[in-house]
């Protein structure tokens, strides 16, 4: 038997005690319900702590650390696994129950702490929401949170999640900066099916990319298009036409251009128009000179055609010496070289041209005589007219005052012209010189190129002696040589002069000039009497021709002829 008083002395089996404990737990369902309430309370406290930690993570890290410690301490005290949601019954269940009982005594303190923490959370988010805590008679309590408080908690949680996501985005942006961005436009150009068909718009856009001006100019200059070549040709043609027209206008101005140069070497100098007024003056002078050239050319042609019309014109407004001068000038156009004529036009002749002075003023001036080559026969007057027209056309369409003309070409043209004049036969000249002169013109004074007076006795030539005397004079001319050292034709003075009274003509160097002038007078006058003591009017080329045909052996013509 077992004595009840001795029950404490008998050791009890531990397994029996555990079974008894289990039976006691089953017998006490109220205690299990209390444990469930405590578990719910701890879970709620855990959630509140977590939310409080998330809300105050930036404000007060120390409080967060303390709350985390408190939460972990509570969790460790009851050994709750929230994911499982139940209590783990340990072998020392009795000790656990003792701890639970001790914790029941601390429930009001925990309740107050939880209430204070929750009020802090609610005051931080939005004040005015209260939390009701219901406690049972067994000191088991639970929280009943109204709907508004729950919504505020959810909003706070969502804000925290957004902040966390924004922080992650900031970190991600730093990482995205290092990533190469793909250009969708370039990817679309390299499509897989672009080899099959290419849109013409893409080709046009690719061709319309602007190039640099240097590349464009290089491309245009290297590869001429037909339109560009045609435009260049038309532009060059227009420029050539304007060039020739300007040069023809300037070549016809002998009286103005003669004052712009100083010597024969000034052929390399150019005349440049400085102002618009110069152009207008040049145009007016060109107009006047063209009119005078036309009048002189028409007068010389009509004089060659018939002596009667010439004789009738002489009695008009023009004087005999003017027509003689014009005719001699027109003949000299064919004999003189092109370069010499250009040098004549640009050589200084102070008021010696018939365009620049009146006949009355020219008669009173002491001028120089011109030495002319012998006139050609009358049968060749048609050929002379053609050559005269060709020479005039060349002069109208050439600009003699260009720097392009060289002295070498000048000398070549002079030598060719001199040879051409030498090849003229004496027979054609003799037939022209054999016509007797019916008039008896008195002797006239002529001045040479060096302002030295030379007597030329113009006496009547008898028919019987004319052939022999003229033949001897022709032989004297042919016996004289030519000196081309300076490019200018000079007739050497003949050593033997014939100072006869009636059959010979006295010469001091002007042999060819006197013969030609006498034959011109004898042909043209046809019985008319020339006025006495009248000085021969010089032509516009009198001074350069005197230079060209000077018969003096020395260079005295360089000392100044004017």
Curated annotation (Swiss-Prot):
One of its GO terms (biological process) is microtubule nucleation. Keywords: Coiled coil. The keyword Lipid metabolism does not apply. Belongs to the SLAIN motif-containing family. This is SLAIN motif-containing protein-like. Residues 292-313, 344-381, 409-562 are annotated as: Disordered. The lineage of its organism: Eukaryota, Metazoa, Chordata, Craniata, Vertebrata. One of its GO terms (cellular component) is microtubule plus-end. The keyword Coiled coil applies. Residues 295-311, 345-355 have a biased composition (Low complexity). Residues 356-370, 424-442, 465-531, 539-553 have a biased composition (Polar residues). It comes from Xenopus laevis.
């Amino acid at each position: 038997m077992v004595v009840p008083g001795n029950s404490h002395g008998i050791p009890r089996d531990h397994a029996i005690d555990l079974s008894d404990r289990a039976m006691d737990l089953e017998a006490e369902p109220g205690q299990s319900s209390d444990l469930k309430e405590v578990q719910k309370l701890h879970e709620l406290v855990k959630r509140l702590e977590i939310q409080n930690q998330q809300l105050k993570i930036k404000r007060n890290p120390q409080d967060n650390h303390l709350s985390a410690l408190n939460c972990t301490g509570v969790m460790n005290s009851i050994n709750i696994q929230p994911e499982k949601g139940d209590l783990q019954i340990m072998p020392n269940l009795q000790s656990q129950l003792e701890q639970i009982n001790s914790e029941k005594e601390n429930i009001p303190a925990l309740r107050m702490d939880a209430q204070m923490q929750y009020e802090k959370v609610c005051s931080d988010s939005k004040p005015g929401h209260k939390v009701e805590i219901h406690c049972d008679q067994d000191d088991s309590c639970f929280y009943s949170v109204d709907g508004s408080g729950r919504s505020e908690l959810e909003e706070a949680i969502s804000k925290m999640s957004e902040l966390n996501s924004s922080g992650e985005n900031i970190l991600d942006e730093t990482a995205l900066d290092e990533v190469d961005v793909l250009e969708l436009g370039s990817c679309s150009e390299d499509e897989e099916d672009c080899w099959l068909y290419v849109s013409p718009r893409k080709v046009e856009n690719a061709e319309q990319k602007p190039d640099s001006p240097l590349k464009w100019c290089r491309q245009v200059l290297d590869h001429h298009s037909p339109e560009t070549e045609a435009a260049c040709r038309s532009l060059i043609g227009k420029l050539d036409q304007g060039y020739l027209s300007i040069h023809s206008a300037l070549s016809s101005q002998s009286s103005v251009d003669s004052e712009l140069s100083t010597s024969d070497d000034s052929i390399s100098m150019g005349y440049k128009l400085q102002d618009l007024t110069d152009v207008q003056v040049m145009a007016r002078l060109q107009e006047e000179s063209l009119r005078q050239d036309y009048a002189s050319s028409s007068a010389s042609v009509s004089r060659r055609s018939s002596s009667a019309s010439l004789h009738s014109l002489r009695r008009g407004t023009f004087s005999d010496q003017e027509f003689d001068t014009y005719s001699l000038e027109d003949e000299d156009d064919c004999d003189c070289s092109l370069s010499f004529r250009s040098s004549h036009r640009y050589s200084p002749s102070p008021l010696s041209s018939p365009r620049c002075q009146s006949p009355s003023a020219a008669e009173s001036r002491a001028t120089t005589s011109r030495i002319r080559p012998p006139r050609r026969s009358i049968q060749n007057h048609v050929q002379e007219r053609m050559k005269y027209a060709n020479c005039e056309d060349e002069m109208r369409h050439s600009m003699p005052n260009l720097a392009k003309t060289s002295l070498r070409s000048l000398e070549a043209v002079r030598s060719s012209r001199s040879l051409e004049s030498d090849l003229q036969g004496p027979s054609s000249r003799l037939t022209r010189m054999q016509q007797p002169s019916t008039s008896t013109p008195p002797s006239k004074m002529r001045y040479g190129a060096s302002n030295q007076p030379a007597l030329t006795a113009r006496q009547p030539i008898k028919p019987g002696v004319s052939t022999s005397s003229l033949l001897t004079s022709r032989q004297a001319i042919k016996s004289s040589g030519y000196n081309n050292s300076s490019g200018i034709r000079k007739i050497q003075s003949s050593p033997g002069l014939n100072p006869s009274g009636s059959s010979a003509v006295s010469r001091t160097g002007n042999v060819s000039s006197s013969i030609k002038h006498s034959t011109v007078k004898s042909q043209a006058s046809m019985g008319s009497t020339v006025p006495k003591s009248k000085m021969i009017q010089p032509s516009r080329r009198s001074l350069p021709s005197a230079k060209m045909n000077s018969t003096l052996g020395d260079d005295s013509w360089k000392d100044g002829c004017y």
